[in-house]
């Protein structure tokens, strides 16, 4: 296989095969390069990142697990890669090409990176911490590793705004005059310490009372620390687990507990327990269970007991 990004020949990936009559040369697809080889925090789950320009000229970067290579051609075609082979070809050369590149990634100078699938501490050794924006805090030997973020599809995003000085002058100074805001900030800064302290449950604080007493302001203060999204209690089981896992080692903010329904109230216990529900795959295997260690800040006009009694009829 050879990649021709440009030149006299039509750009693309070409396959050459020696035959009795000479050399059979044919184009497989448009230019397709592997920009990285990755593995997970357990040293398993290897994959590659494939880059190409789609039909409208936009550069696409797609992660493909090595266990997914057999279906790589159809996946890439669906994302806009021009493939010369007919759709559904029984023996597509695209997976073979990608596998050949993987087998020789060191010789080709392709970087090997550690894939991070969630934020927070990466192991029980507490030597590396992944921030939501992809920045890694990894002193010592771990600082020599290269990392890439690969958060689950649908995971809530985080946002970075302003500078540390602006935060200190606005939120920090205001907290000196507000007990609620100060407490909410302490809860937020405590989140990365939960695993370090070996706590089994995820603690939290619920601010309740009438309007205009600073509940939402306090919660927004918590969200400002790591750029968390200001969530609500209107959640399903599945999405709540995804949101909680995406806030591992970080504070999670849920506003207005009155929006919770009867089933949602049970999520309060699930979030505190730090573990989602066990589920089966369509093939009868066990799906990966979401886990987390976080701090929770919640708001509402009612206490959690009052809200639960209203929704479920039980205290």
What are these regions (language model features)?
Residues 178, 193-196, 238-243, 257, ...:
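Generic recognition of flexible, low-complexity loop/linker segments
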Residues 142-228:
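P-loop NTPase catalytic core of nucleic-acid-dependent motor ATPases
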């Amino acid at each position: 296989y050879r990649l021709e990004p440009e030149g006299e020949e039509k750009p693309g990936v070409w396959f050459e095969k020696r035959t009795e009559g000479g050399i059979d040369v044919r184009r497989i697809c448009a230019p397709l390069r592997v920009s990285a080889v990755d593995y997970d925090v357990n040293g398993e789950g290897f994959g590659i990142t494939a880059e190409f320009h789609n039909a409208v000229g936009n550069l696409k970067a797609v992660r493909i697990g090595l266990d997914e290579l057999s279906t790589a051609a159809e996946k890439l075609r669906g994302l806009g890669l021009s493939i010369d082979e007919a759709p559904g070809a029984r023996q597509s050369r695209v997976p073979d090409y990608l596998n050949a590149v993987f087998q020789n990634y060191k010789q080709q100078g392709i970087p090997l990176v550690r894939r991070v699938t969630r934020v927070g501490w990466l192991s029980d050794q507490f030597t590396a911490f992944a921030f939501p924006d992809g920045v890694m805090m990894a002193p010592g030997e771990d600082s020599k590793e290269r990392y890439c973020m690969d958060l689950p599809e649908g995971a809530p995003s985080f946002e970075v705004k302003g500078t540390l000085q602006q935060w200190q002058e606005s939120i920090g100074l205001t907290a000196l005059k507000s007990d609620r805001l100060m407490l909410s900030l302490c809860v937020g800064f405590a989140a990365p310490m939960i695993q370090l302290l070996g706590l089994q449950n995820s603690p939290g604080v619920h601010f309740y009372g009438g309007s205009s007493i600073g509940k939402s302001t306090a919660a927004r203060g918590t969200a400002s620390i790591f750029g968390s999204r200001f969530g609500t209690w209107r959640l399903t089981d599945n999405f709540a687990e995804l949101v909680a896992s995406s806030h591992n080692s970080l504070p999670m903010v849920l506003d207005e507990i009155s929006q919770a329904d009867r089933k949602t109230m049970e999520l309060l216990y699930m979030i505190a327990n730090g573990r989602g529900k066990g589920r089966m795959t369509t093939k009868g295997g066990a799906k990966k269970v979401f886990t987390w260690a976080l701090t929770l800040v919640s708001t509402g006009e009612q206490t959690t007991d009052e809200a639960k009694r209203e929704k479920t009829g039980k205290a």
